[in-house]
Amino acid sequence: MNKLIRRAVTIFAVTSVASLFASGVLETSMAESLSTNVISLADTKAKDNTSHKSKKARKNHSKETPVDRKEVAPVHESKATGPKQDSCFGRMYTVKVNDDRNVEITQAVPEYATVGSPYPIEITATGKRDCVDVIITQQLPCEAEFVRSDPATTPTADGKLVWKIDRLGQGEKSKITVWVKPLKEGCCFTAATVCACPEIRSVTKCGQPAICVKQEGPENACLRCPVVYKINVVNQGTATARNVVVENPVPDGYAHSSGQRVLTFTLGDMQPGEHRTITVEFCPLKRGRATNIATVSYCGGHKNTASVTTVINEPCVQVSIAGADWSYVCKPVEYVISVSNPGDLVLRDVVVEDTLSPGVTVLEAAGAQISCNKVVWTVKELNPGESLQYKVLVRAQTPGQFTNNVVVKSCSDCGTCTSCAEATTYWKGVAATHMCVVDTCDPVCVGENTVYRICVTNRGSAEDTNVSLMLKFSKELQPVSFSGPTKGTITGNTVVFDSLPRLGSKETVEFSVTLKAVSAGDARGEAILSSDTLTVPVSDTENTHIY
């Protein structure tokens, strides 16, 4: 126990003296004197404290030998450096300086050595942060001869060894071993210092962006059907591409829903390996080839383009119908239907459907299926440039304006295709105006009255217009009064009625004239009928016997 106390006191005291010596505060002779006194004092204290209790001994020891634990770390035994056989020095102990700034340095020396026999001094520098230009200086002990060092160096004129380490990383250690040979008895003081510049490292990652663009689109498309293109943009480089922009002019013959002619897509920054997809949709307005070109650009880079060419096809079917503009009812009329394929694709399952208005009767339609007023033809295929012709014979039973509607439906690689046409015929009727004249009393005595009734009937299928009636009587009869659908005038033995503007088909009107028998004889009454339809007036005569 006494031996341990002596060793601890000696180490702490010697370390303090060595620190003062290295800093230049103590001269060599003074350091040796202080070391000798410290060792003697430690021996005396160890003997005096033997009779005291352990608790009191520790208390007195701490009062008489104060140590700054922050500056000097506890002593640790080194794992011996130097030869294992025939060593003339004691076990190594280490003095550690806690420098929490740049570099931590420790120094290990043996407890004792033999005059004339070399012993090692081990210096270890540990980087607490990245440092450069690390300089370690070792003050050789006085009255000792330098033998060698690892790494090798040469003592300076004032007995110092200097090593320079270009760089010492954080946590990295650098070890130096110095062998010296003591020349006389006494304490060999040695001190080491370190100086380092902290290193700050900044990393700038340099790379090259590489923006590539590809485009996907159909080889063929249909007129007025949506065409979709996919624009794929990828950064295949090693750096971020800044301000990536894709421009897509609208191809000639295309239209975009926005109405713009150039579409611009701002993608912003793209990291290495990042992929973006843009979808654009156009409506083709004309047949032919159309090329969609997409151009990508970015900050500091070259522009890249990708294009896709699409052939715009028109699955077109056309139909027309021709017939008489007008005709008389019950007279047959022929319609000619023409179907053609002016497009680029084969039309399949072609159906031609002709629908007639009610009141029109189908008389004949070669190769068609007839159902009431509907006529249907079917064709399996209609090649581009090919045309077909069909005829249908019809007749209207009543006058009027009737329309004949034709619709053609077909299928193609671009979907269904439809076309329609119509023809209107005005069917005219024929007016047939007839007249009938009768007297109500026959024979008649002089002085009595009789009535002539005139019935006018349009037996035709069309109206008659401006129907006029005039009656002439012989001298035996004197007109007294009249009635009818229009006004009349009596002039002597003649009665004239105003014209009837319209006499419809199957319509009948009646005129009447009251006559007085004024003299005996065989009297006559003549009715004369005229109209726009009657190119020559029609007359009818009635006789009346008067006695």
UniProtKB/Swiss-Prot annotation:
Protein name: Large cysteine-rich periplasmic protein OmcB, serovar C
Positions of the propeptide removed during maturation: 23-40
GO biological process terms on file: regulation of cell shape
Compartment(s): Periplasm
Composition bias type Basic residues, residue spans: 52-61
Domain of life: Bacteria
Naturally occurring in which organism (per UniProt): Chlamydia trachomatis
Lineage of source species: Bacteria, Pseudomonadati, Chlamydiota, Chlamydiia, Chlamydiales
Segments of this protein annotated with the region Disordered: 45-84
Coiled-coil segments on the chain, per record: none
